[in-house]
A protein has these predicted regions:
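C-terminal motif of bacterial Sec signal peptides marking the signal peptidase cleavage site
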Residues: 17-21
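Repetitive helical segments and hydrophobic/amphipathic motifs
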Residues: 12-13
């Protein structure tokens, strides 16, 4: 029962609409889906569930070398720097193996501590520490909007590893489809951009949220935070739970139009 259970099997290829050619001369998007579950050694009523759904390029009109570089950027965005060089499915398996090993160690230790505490305090009611040891991790990576040579790749992740509630994040990455490199916020803007762009972000937030709500938010966090994506409209910053508002407010997005950002953009990265 302790062996890893592969619940969905291998990759499921989902072709992009209207694309049917398998030629490297055309672009084909696929989605790799993987689901794992493993029970806790101490109690098989507790388990960890791991789910990955990752879009990547199966073929790319820019050629194989560029496709590999873009897919490396996707692996880095979804799984981390240490997995670059692996295919999406290989990275998914490697990450899952690590998470499962960590679960057995960390959740196992928590289980033993909960159980010892319960016994030491004479708890005789029907309670099991397995309640806090049902963990999960989910990662979804998908192509977002695109502007000129810049492609937004959106990574949503959520997890529960014990405690009152889980956590979730939605983080965009910008990939230059001309060279496969990840474009950071510092690449996108000229030096000295932080102060003026902070002002633009606050103006947009106050306009969208309303003055009363805006005043209750965490003003110190309303800065360019490096978690931004691009679209035809402008640059969108994503603020995670607790970053500029309470957990209940969730993920907050704010878009600043290109026209307002133009004086601060790095023309070597993006020419408007």
């Amino acid at each position: 029962m302790q062996n890893r259970i592969l619940t969905l099997g291998a990759a499921v290829a989902m072709l992009a609409a209207g694309l049917c050619s398998c030629s490297e001369k055309e672009t084909e998007v696929a989605t790799y889906e993987n689901n794992y579950e493993q029970t806790l050694v101490q109690d098989d009523s507790a388990s960890v569930q791991i789910s990955h759904s990752i879009q990547y390029y199966k073929s790319y009109e820019g050629g194989r070398a560029l496709r590999r570089k873009i897919n490396d950027a996707i692996v880095r965005s979804c799984f981390g720097e240490e997995y670059v060089g692996l295919k999406v499915e290989e990275a998914s398996d490697a990450v899952s193996d690590t998470l499962i090993a960590n679960y057995q160690k960390d959740a196992g230790e928590s289980y033993d501590e909960y159980l010892a505490y319960s016994k030491n305090n004479g708890n005789d009611y029907d309670w099991t520490p397995a309640t806090f040891c049902n963990w999960y991790y989910r990662t979804v990576g998908a192509f977002g909007e695109k502007f000129m040579n810049l492609q937004t790749y959106q990574v949503f992740s959520e997890s529960y590893t014990g405690g009152a509630h889980g956590m979730y994040y939605s983080i965009p990455y910008i990939i230059d489809i001309n060279n496969g490199e990840i474009v950071t916020e510092n690449d996108l803007f000229l030096p000295g951009y932080v102060a003026p762009v902070t002002g633009l972000i606050k103006e947009e937030l106050e306009s969208e949220q309303g003055s009363d709500t805006f005043e209750t938010m965490f003003q110190d966090g309303m800065v360019p935070n490096g978690k931004c994506g691009v679209s035809g409209e402008g640059v969108t910053w994503f603020y995670q739970p607790y970053e500029i508002a309470s957990y209940a407010e969730g993920i907050i997005k704010v878009t600043v139009p290109w026209a307002e950002l133009k004086p601060y953009l790095n023309s070597e990265c993006l020419k408007l």
